[in-house]
């Protein structure tokens, strides 16, 4: 692999690891994130048990998406991308952006509507890394 492909590989891997880190965090939490509390203005224990069950389920779904995105990217990087498969140069960023763009949109929307300190920068960083990786494969 050329130097630019190695840097692209690292950018993609870092983007994938951001997604995996958030996915693991959402999967293992027993209550919502501090920025979720900010958004709804209510502590976890004050919520109706059925609402807690619903929110926990939604967090698990989000975790699954983030984990699927990150793990898929890492597998694609390790096998077809490293082997120089042209289609992988498009599949890796596609997987990353399909997962990251809606997530970033949601964090921005929640921040604007509620004032909660959602992780906009982390989401944006993941997207920047994926886009940078794609650009580097085309140089």
Show which residues each predicted segment covers.
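Membrane-water interface at the C-terminal end of transmembrane alpha helices
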Residues: 128-139
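Membrane-helix boundary connector in multi-pass membrane proteins
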Residues: 102-121, 138-139
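Hydrophobic alpha-helical membrane segments
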Residues: 72, 89-107, 124-130
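Hydrophobic transmembrane helix segments
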Residues: 17-52, 56-58, 71
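Juxtamembrane helix-break-helix junctions at the cytosolic face
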Residues: 70-89
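Membrane-interfacial loop-to-transmembrane alpha-helix junctions, especially the N-terminal start
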Residues: 35-36, 85-93
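Long, highly hydrophobic alpha-helical transmembrane signal-anchor segments
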Residues: 1-25
């Amino acid at each position: 692999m050329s130097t630019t492909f190695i840097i692209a590989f690292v950018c993609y891997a870092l983007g994938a690891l951001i997604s995996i880190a958030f996915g693991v965090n959402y999967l293992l939490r027993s209550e919502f994130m501090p920025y979720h509390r900010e958004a709804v203005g209510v502590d976890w224990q004050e919520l109706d048990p059925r609402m807690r069950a619903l929110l926990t389920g939604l967090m698990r779904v989000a975790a699954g998406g983030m984990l699927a995105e990150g793990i898929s990217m890492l597998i694609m990087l390790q096998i077809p991308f490293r082997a120089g498969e042209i289609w992988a140069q498009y599949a890796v960023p596609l997987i990353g952006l399909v997962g990251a763009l809606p997530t970033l949109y949601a964090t921005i929307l929640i921040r604007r509507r509620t004032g909660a300190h959602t992780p906009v920068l982390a989401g944006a960083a993941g997207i920047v890394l994926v886009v940078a990786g794609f650009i580097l494969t085309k140089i």
